[in-house]
């Protein structure tokens, strides 16, 4: 055991950047449709580790960096898959950033049958509600959504990836 680490502090460094990504895929099976959506979003060839919805304090919003293949990437994401031809599925993420930069931000993810505008509106409202429940003031809310109209098996995907500068 490392005696230099306090038991009340994590030995892991919190990520200091976040990136919003979204994509869609349509192919012959659900897993490949999901993988195609990751390719479209630019976050393929890494291992997504699903996290709950907290943005570390003072994290910077940046375009998705060049993450080494095979990396373990903390990610809050939503996705929706369907095999109903002609159906539209969507996924969206939002991030509420606090006015007080010592506080954490909130990441929300949502997916649904229907278009991306409604899904993005819903996920933005979820972020607003999360801040209201905490009694915090919002500086801004950012969001991103995708949609896929199914031809074979379709998938819509949206995510917030946390990484390091």
Swiss-Prot record:
An annotated Gene Ontology molecular function: arginine decarboxylase activity
Necessary cofactors: pyruvate
Reactions mediated catalytically: L-arginine + H(+) = agmatine + CO2
Enzyme Commission designation: 4.1.1.19
UniProt key word Plastid: no
HAMAP family reported for this sequence: PvlArgDC
Protein family: Belongs to the PdaD family.
Name of the featured protein: Pyruvoyl-dependent arginine decarboxylase
Organism: Methanococcus aeolicus (strain ATCC BAA-1280 / DSM 17508 / OCM 812 / Nankai-3)
Phylogenetic placement of the source organism: Archaea, Methanobacteriati, Methanobacteriota, Methanomada group, Methanococci
């Amino acid at each position: 055991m490392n005696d230099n680490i306090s038991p009340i502090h994590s030995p892991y460094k919190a990520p200091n950047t976040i990136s919003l990504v979204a994509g869609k895929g349509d192919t012959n099976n659900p897993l490949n449709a999901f993988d195609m959506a990751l390719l479209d979003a630019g976050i393929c060839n890494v291992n997504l580790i699903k996290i709950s919805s907290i943005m570390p304090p003072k994290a910077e919003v940046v375009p998705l960096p060049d993450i080494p293949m095979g990396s373990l990437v903390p990610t809050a994401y939503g996705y929706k898959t369907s095999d109903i031809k002609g159906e539209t599925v969507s996924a969206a993420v939002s991030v509420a950033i606090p006015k007080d930069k010592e506080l954490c931000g909130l990441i929300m993810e949502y997916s649904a049958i229907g278009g991306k505008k409604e899904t993005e509106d819903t996920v933005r409202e979820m972020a607003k509600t999360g801040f209201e429940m905490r009694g915090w003031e919002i500086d801004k809310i950012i969001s991103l959504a995708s949609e896929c109209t199914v031809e074979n098996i379709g998938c819509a995907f949206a995510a917030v990836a946390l990484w390091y500068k």
